[in-house]
Each structure stands twice: as structure tokens, then as C-alpha cells.
Regions:
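Active-site-adjacent loops and short helices of periplasmic peptidoglycan-processing enzymes
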Residues: 1-101, 111
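Penicillin-recognizing serine hydrolase domain
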Residues: 58-171
Length: 171
């Protein structure tokens, strides 16, 4: 069926065990899809990424397949996803691969969705009915770079520091 921000998403055991940046989801908790998407965009919540992938596709591996299909549709010729969260690969897993140009293509697609840009430019927001604070991984840039209105940061040892950002100045 059709996916909606109002969908209820039940957290699986697997999603609750994902590390890195997280919102500490617990197995069996239920959230609106909107809340999990907000946590992903604002605070890079890897556990929420897995919960959303499972909700959309049943299994994260099926969602990764959809991610790669969509990347091809967008013309991202040198991108290959092996995870839904971008964390360093575990033993026997491959590292996600992309280029700056391919990430530009993805960013241009995301700009077609105003809610994404609103979330990615939000410095601080609440989660879990106000009991947990989402701090944007871009918070220093949003605060200190005039016109910065969002997108995404990333880091792990093998990939290094990564940034896709947008800014608007003088219209």
C-alpha cells in the first residue's frame, strides 16, 4: 500500500540494536513514521533508519535494493548502497560507495520535498513527546554559516568526513 507520515511503525529487535547516532529505540515501541523521519534527518538516527526501512519494505535488505534502484533512476552512476544507515560495515559487509556528484543529484531530489529541508535546517527539536532532544548533526553550520539551510553530515573512520549542504543567499 501507500506509505504515509501518519503510519504507525513498530520497532523491531534488530532496529533497537543498531548503534552509532541513535534515538535509543526500544523493541516494541510504536512511532508515527513522521517522528522517525524527523529523527533520521535531524540527528542521523541509525536505529530509526532501520525501523523505517523495515516498515517500508519488510526487511532492510529489500529497502537497500529499492535505494539502489532509485539511485539509478536519479542518474547516480557511481553509487552503491549496502546499508540503510551508512554506518561502517560489519565483518563480511561492503562499504557504501558514492561520489560528490552523485550526492549532489540526491540532494537536488531531496530539495523537491520541502519537509526534508525544514527538518535538515532545524537545529534542535524534541522526540518521544519531548523527553528526548534531537540535536542536528549540522548544528554548528546552521548557526554559523549565513544562509545555511540544511542537508546532511556524515563520518566514520573508513569514509572520513562527509558533507552535503545547501545555502541560500540573496534569493
Amino acid at each position: 500500500g501507500r506509505i504515509s507520515f501518519q503510519d504507525s511503525v513498530k520497532v523491531s529487535r534488530w532496529a533497537s540494536k543498531i548503534g552509532g547516532h541513535q534515538v535509543y529505540l526500544k523493541q516494541g515501541e510504536v512511532f508515527q513514521l513522521r517522528e522517525l523521519m524527523k529523527a533520521i534527518v535531524i540527528s542521523s538516527a541509525n536505529d530509526a533508519s532501520v525501523a523505517v526501512a523495515e516498515h517500508v519494505s519488510g526487511r532492510d535488505k529489500q529497502f537497500i535494493k529499492k535505494m539502489n534502484e532509485r539511485a539509478i533512476e536519479l542518474g547516480m552512476k557511481k553509487t552503491r548502497f549496502f546499508s540503510v544507515h551508512g554506518l561502517p560495515p560489519g565483518r563480511g559487509q561492503k562499504l557504501d560507495e558514492s561520489t560528490a556528484f552523485d550526492m549532489y543529484l540526491l540532494a537536488m531530489e531531496l530539495l523537491k520535498h520541502p519537509q526534508y529541508l525544514r527538518w535538515s535546517s532545524t537545529r534542535l527539536d524534541s522526540f518521544r513527546n519531548g523527553t528526548f532532544q534531537l540535536l542536528n548533526t549540522n548544528h554548528r553550520l546552521i548557526r554559523n554559516y549565513r544562509g545555511m539551510d540544511g542537508m546532511k553530515t556524515g563520518y566514520h573512520r573508513r569514509a572520513g568526513f562527509n558533507l552535503v549542504s545547501t545555502a541560500e543567499r540573496e534569493g
